[in-house]
Amino acid sequence: TDVPNLFTMNQICILSNGLETRLGAFNAGYEFFFEWLKNSEEDVIDRESIKDNALSIQYMADSLLNKETLIDYIENFILFENKHIKIIAKNHQYLGVNNLYNSFQRREELNGKIGVFWHTQGSGKSYSMVMFARKVNRKMHGNFTFLVVTDREDLDTQIHKNFVRTEVIGANDETQPKNSVQLRSFLQSNKQFIFTLIHKFGWDKVTNGNYPNLSTRDDIIVM
């Protein structure tokens, strides 16, 4: 209370007792602090060795606290939800989003298929999408459209809300087509974000003939 703004500019906090090292935001409870042990997806973690030799702080220093990595993290992997709740990327999100970003830079070589980013339930998939979209828009030139396709209305709503809460899109932006006709209209426009359920791509071939070409653009990113 004596220095209420002491942590206003703080980006990340690291806690360590030598045996265990965790990363988190200053306003988060300890249960939301997490390990950072991998510098790449290929790293194999020997937890017994790390614990026995008190190496967790060294792993943090060699990976996240590397100058280039830390600058990238601060620039692209910190979000604010509803202006007040700070959300920072976990180890798997940082590595996964950057793998997608690197693949996206090679999209022509990869025939437009930039990969699969697998998440377990509750591991922050919608925030990973936000971080990926923000980094692409911030670091790359282009007029990209991000098309987020889901198969459940609750999931579509959740992802859309997280994009709104982190101010990537506005609450009143028209980004969720109500039906197939509006979806096709959205895809013919230059909307930056579109959130849709997969069934809205449905088409009655008997009544309407062959499926139409929805867009000739090569800068639509499907997630």
Task: Locate predicted features.
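Conserved long hydrophobic alpha-helices within structured protein cores
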Residues: 91-99, 189-198
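ATP-dependent helicase/translocase motor core
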Residues: 1-145, 154, 158-170, 217
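Short alpha-helical segments and helix-capping/turn motifs at coil-helix boundaries
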Residues: 1-2, 178-182, 205-209
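Generic enzyme active-site microenvironment
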Residues: 15, 149, 223
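Short, surface-exposed, polar/charged, turn-prone segments marking secondary-structure boundaries
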Residues: 40-44, 174-178, 221
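Conserved nucleic-acid-binding Ia/Ib motif block in the N-terminal RecA-like helicase ATPase lobe
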Residues: 147, 153-194
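A short beta-strand-to-loop transition that corresponds to the Sensor-1 phosphate-sensing loop
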Residues: 17-19, 152, 196-200
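Conserved RecA-like ASCE ATPase "motif II neighborhood" in helicase/translocase motors
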Residues: 192-223
